């Protein structure tokens, strides 16, 4: 596809979501020919994710909070994961509405929902990294770590939230509502004449310390954890880790594609990778598609707990029995059938 050199045909500012002011006077604009994703499909997807996340994560938090006596260290981490997903889910109606007429909610909401999106992502991977370290120390080194003391776990979680806020702060500071010529308003970073330089900083540094480093920590810890479990033939403990492994896998499947496409977009914006109209169109569409996948993650963890976490199901039934919604006989039968698959001091109550 050849570039269209007439600047009246296409304004670089018109690019959606990741659009930014021109960074090079010699840049030759091109017409965006790739079809965008059907906005109604996106809206319906966001609406379903919002409802499922609101219901599912509320139930997860309820089950964990009800199990005061038997709450494990991992439960505290998963409680914070559910809280992060729940807070992000509250912004999904706004993201859905922005797909219709662009960003019509002003600069303040642009900053707030962008902050919640980034905090949800970073807190998620940091908490999962903490779980991996805790499981590594408990299984590989067979020791009760400092995080076994519940009050210290709370400080670790507060540290994860604080670091997530710091990594996400640039999006709160620099994002604003912007209305390009001949296009719908957008919500993105406005960084002045040094947009290219600062965009690289704002993307590479947070994703290095908020994604790549925690990812390698998880790969290291779970690699040695699995090795220890298989060598020792610890089948029961291996089954107890299924929920945690599933949570980590789903997180990576949902967010890794978006971050890889975002990296490609950044490298093209900063001229590290040569940009062409075809590449720009493909990356723009890929960003839209993978962003939806990332947003869907907020409703998936409760589904994992419901299908894999036997103790989560039992905890939920216990709450129902306390309120007379199921019989105690049914609860007792469920406890007997799930007893052989439960674990002690290895996994969470989920």
From Swiss-Prot:
Q: Which GO terms describe its molecular function?
A: C-C chemokine binding; C-C chemokine receptor activity; C-X-C chemokine receptor activity; interleukin-8 binding
Top-rank taxon of the source lineage equals Eukaryota
Q: Where are the transmembrane segments?
A: 40-66, 76-96, 112-133, 155-174, 200-220, 243-264, 286-308
Residues assigned to the Cytoplasmic compartment are 67-75, 134-154, 221-242, 309-350
Q: Name one GO biological process term.
A: calcium-mediated signaling
* Assembly with partners or alone: Interacts with IL8. Interacts with GNAI2.
Question: SUPFAM superfamilies from the entry?
Answer: Family A G protein-coupled receptor-like
> What are the glycosylated positions?
3, 16
Q: Which organism is it from?
A: Gorilla gorilla gorilla (Western lowland gorilla)
An annotated GO cellular component: external side of plasma membrane
Q: Which UniProt keywords apply?
A: Cell membrane, Chemotaxis, Disulfide bond, G-protein coupled receptor, Glycoprotein, Membrane, Receptor, Transducer, Transmembrane, Transmembrane helix
Q: How does it sit in the membrane?
A: Multi-pass membrane protein
Chain's role:
Receptor to interleukin-8, which is a powerful neutrophils chemotactic factor. Binding of IL-8 to the receptor causes activation of neutrophils. This response is mediated via a G-protein that activates a phosphatidylinositol-calcium second messenger system.
Gene3D superfamilies associated with the record: Rhodopsin 7-helix transmembrane proteins (1.20.1070.10)
What is this protein called in UniProt?
A: C-X-C chemokine receptor type 1
Q: Which Pfam families match?
A: 7tm_1 (PF00001)
Question: Extracellular compartment: which residues?
Answer: 1-39, 97-111, 175-199, 265-285
Q: List the disulfide bonds.
A: 110-187
Q: Which CDD domains match?
A: 7tmA_CXCR1_2 (cd15178)
Q: Which InterPro entries does the record associate with it?
A: CCR1-9-like, Chemokine_CXCR1, Chemokine_CXCR_1/2, GPCR_Rhodpsn, GPCR_Rhodpsn_7TM
Indicate the family of this protein: Belongs to the G-protein coupled receptor 1 family.
User: Ribonucleoprotein: present as a keyword of the record?
Assistant: no
- Give the gene that encodes this protein: CXCR1
